Amino acid sequence: LLKLPVEKEFLIGGIMFEVGEVAVYPGHGVGRIESIEEREFSGTKQAFYVMRILDTDMTIMVPVDGSKNSGLRSVINSNEVKKVYEILKEKNVAHDNAPWNRRYKEYMEKIKSGSIFEVAMVLRELYSLKVWKELSFGEKKMFEIARNLIKKELSIALTKDENEVEEEIEEIFTKNYKE
């Protein structure tokens, strides 16, 4: 196991990640790049980002060469934050009467896409569904996953406390679904 010098950076899809930076890994959320390591597999050396997911403390190794394909990306900027809030504020969400297993599959695909906008749509749809009927165990779990992914990334993007961001999200939904 070789550790590469900290000053060595890698360009990925126009984005350079350095040790200490935060990035988003699809389906897992925000993590910190702890190191860039080189490992040898079948005689070929390959560089990896070693990333610790902030919420779960899980460590993920992402091949530097394949990180763009894996969906590794920077935390969103202020314009993208506005777009997330716009998605959450959308009203008149159509309720999909598809069986739960089909909705679950669609929601998981959106969550694993790495797009915070897709995750915001999942959160909005599940909140809307929650107003309409009691969520099943699986739906509640999916709701929590989506909410936590959104809350963590927005709190870092806005440099706000997670509880404050959660309150803002709850306020949006409360206004949208007043009875």
Language model regions located:
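A general, composition-driven signal for non-globular sequence regions
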Residues: 2-5, 22, 141
